[in-house]
Amino acid sequence: MISVSKLSKQYGNQVVLKDVDLEFAKGQSVALIGPNGSGKTTLIKSILGLVVPDEGKIEVQGANIRTSPNYRRDIGYMPQLSRFPEQMQVRQLFSLIDDLRKGEDGIEKDLSLYEDFQIDRIARKALGALSGGMKQQVSAALAFYYNPEIIILDEPTAGLDPVSNEILKAKINRQISLGRLVVVTSHILSDLDEICNHVVYLMEGKIYMNASIDQIASETGEQKLNKMIVKLIENKNSDE
């Protein structure tokens, strides 16, 4: 569903991505992880067309993103920080999205998170008056709103209360069962244990690890993602 080939990006003298090759398939839920500054955000923004790479090619569902801008209709995106117009009401934001997508035929909206988070009760509130957790709920509901085939979630559980956290994780797992592609970044690796079946670990702009959770568990003998990562890094360092 997403193919990344020889992707490189540099800001001044800082190399952010270097010859990145990746393939993301239907039914995968990918944990995109790595230290701060490893290139995760730049990779996501490159896929979304928000950053123009210096070299390389990205295809989404077979379409080159440089020549097929409509590919983004198939992607639901939840940013790490949502910058909503502060004076706009929640209901107006959803209406605005509806207006922007008007004329697209055959799309059935997914209101499950809207309903599960009970967003109706805050629909007339100004976005600027919402708590951080409420903004995360709105952002998550928007990411799934138009039933996308690909969902990209950047730190999705940050700021969510425990109940909302479980609701969102259950939603992600339902999407995986439907064959959707989910890409998740998070520093809370314990959350990723429950929703991801594949790991891409970036370090200094390069792919350090690209494997299924089952494969990593078999290699390390560990069942928790954070322990798997530590064991693999220790093993690699001891081999060098």
Language-model-detected regions and their locations in the chain:
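Conserved structural motif at the start of ABC-family nucleotide-binding domains
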Residues: I2, L17-D19
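The feature captures the beta-strand-to-loop junction immediately N-terminal to the Walker
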Residues: I33-P35
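Helix-to-loop junction immediately C-terminal to a conserved catalytic motif
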Residues: L48
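Conserved ABC transporter NBD signature motif
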Residues: G56-Y71
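Conserved ABC ATPase "signature" region
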Residues: S95, D105-I122
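Catalytic Walker B motif of ABC-type/P-loop ATPase nucleotide-binding domains
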Residues: I151-E155
